[in-house]
Amino acid sequence: MPFAPQIPDGSKTPGDPDLFGLSDGGEAFSKNLLPGDGRVFYRSGLLEQPVADESFKALLSGGFWRNDEVVMFGRRRVLSRKMAWFGDLPYAYAGALKQPVPWDAEVLRLKSRVEQAGGCVFNSCLLNHYADGREGMGWHSDDESSLLPNGPIASVSLGARRVFRFKHRRTLEQVEVWLEHGSLLLMEGETQSHWVHALPKSLRVREPRVNLTFRVMREP
């Protein structure tokens, strides 16, 4: 299930408006942010400011948030960061099993918007709520066996502007991008195999952020 069409003649780049079916007149995707071994595209204006504000407010007040849990050194640890998992199947990562909750109307609305922009159908979504810059995410990759291998991952950012970093597993080369309110980041191809990514903590950030990561789960 390819996320972006192949470009056999090199005549188009991810910035071309028609490559991702961007018929809404919004911002175009960037060119590939990675130097190789994967594909990452960024679009700053997926949602207009009023729409992004409305979505952010609706999600913050959602009743689906739960404290995230991880298993470290055989012990279960409850994190301050809130999360929610939407989909038909449970999702296991960091040693803990996340049970799905019923799809929320606002999440479905954003899912439809992302699918329209990216040309792919997603069947699950992981939400993370970062209260401020004291909460972040360390180096990791989204390569769980329950996910479609080399499948697309689409990340929508709402709220505080945060830096997002990629690091190549072998060369340790790093790439960073600032994720704006209402933006979309697309990861596809072999990105998860060759790169890890992180959301660094920052005491300068005092506002909350909500991140929606749309994924494709394997059918059982």
Regions found by a protein language model. Give the residues of each.
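Non-heme Fe(II) oxygenase metal-center motifs and adjacent flexible, charged/small-residue loops
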Residues: 1-220
